[in-house]
Regions:
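Low-acidity, Ser/Thr- and Arg-rich intrinsically disordered low-complexity segments
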Residues: 169-172, 176-182, 187-188
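Beta1/beta-strand and adjacent pyrophosphate-binding region of the FAD-binding site
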Residues: 1-11
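Glycine-rich flavin
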Residues: 2-3, 19-26, 31-171
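Hydrophobic alpha-helical segments that mediate membrane insertion or helix-helix packing
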Residues: 7, 18-21, 175, 187
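N-terminal Rossmann-fold NAD(P) dinucleotide-binding loop
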Residues: 14
């Protein structure tokens, strides 16, 4: 298979580059080993903003008496909050898939390995299939992975780790009973 532009990585840098190249009339392929949208859309920026918004609403309701509004027994449903963040990520992931099809970008699911300046092998998820493709131009946009800084100790009983299991799909509420303190993991400080 021959492309004019082959993009390795389907995160914000990769899929935008692929779409733009296709809009310019080039034959484009894109290789992504996990989910279109990368870490940002699936496990970072987008789902964390959904969780932060839930924490913001929760805090506003808890302190609504300052505005003359009384709300008694304010509570939250942790599983629904997390599910909403997953649903938003899934919807956006599907939107990127639609844009790939709309712009005639051939997508490959698997791990890319550069063989030469113009040739790439793609190891499928099943690890039994390998596809070789060539391209006049190759864009490497492989993104990021979460990591724990060596000098930073993390209390895994209180803060779930994105390294062990994705934090946005943990099966139950963390031991901290406060949604806002749990969300604090994503920002340097919480609003009061």
């Amino acid at each position: 298979m021959q492309f004019q532009v082959l993009v390795i990585g389907g995160g914000p840098g990769g899929y935008v580059a692929a779409i733009r190249a296709a809009q310019l009339g080039l034959k484009v392929g894109l290789i992504e080993k996990e989910n279109l949208g990368g870490v940002c859309l699936n496990w970072g920026c987008i789902p964390s903003k959904a969780l932060l918004k839930a924490a913001e609403y929760y805090q506003q309701i808890k302190h609504s008496d300052e505005f003359g509004i009384t709300c008694e027994k304010v509570s939250f449903d942790f599983n629904r909050i997390v599910q909403r963040s997953r649903d938003i990520a899934s919807q956006m992931n599907n939107g990127i898939g639609f844009l790939m099809k709309k712009n005639n970008i051939q997508t490959f699911e698997g791990t890319a390995r550069l063989i030469s300046a113009t040739e790439v092998s793609i190891q499928g998820k099943t690890e039994t299939t390998t596809t070789k493709v060539t391209s006049d131009n190759i864009i490497v946009s492989t993104g990021a992975r979460p990591t724990i800084l060596p000098h930073l100790e993390v209390d895994y009983d209180r803060v779930p780790s994105a390294l062990n299991s994705p934090i946005f799909s943990i099966p139950s509420e963390p031991k901290s009973n406060s949604l806002n303190s749990w969300i604090a993991f994503f920002r340097s400080k919480t609003k009061k």
